[in-house]
Amino acid sequence: MSFVGGSMISPGGAEANEYNQKKENNPTRGLYIAEDKDGKPQPTVNLMMRHGVRSALEYASSKDLQKALAVRNPELAPHLTFYDAGGHGYATVRVDAGTMVTEFVCIPRPLERSPGVDGGPLRYRVRHEVPLWQAGERPQMRQTVVEGDAGLAV
């Protein structure tokens, strides 16, 4: 069981793709980024890494996550349950004798300082819970979107 986190405040690859993946004459753009139904950029690289090329391209074309997941490659990256190349925030880890719980807490892109003392708005909070497993068994992870919308990350 492992979790990898990136930077809390530095721009990541998903944000860079908004600027370096040009819309014109770029047939591979949909693998990295596409606009949703409201015209906001979405990191289709999350879909590509978890579900495959067809899923990313389907989302870029249809703007429909369910259609994109319907054409997923279930053999791709079976070890990944969550991937957010454009998230900002932090993770907490709690471990006791029977369970490990990791929560990813994501905030909107921090373009300016939050005026409140509460740290500002939340984009999503996703919990990954793994009960203790026995030698020779595979760990079983339960993922729950506790708050917000994790978008293309799940």
Question: What is the role of each PLM region?
Answer:
Residues 1-154:
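Long, structured stretches of catalytic cores involved in phosphate-ester chemistry, encompassing
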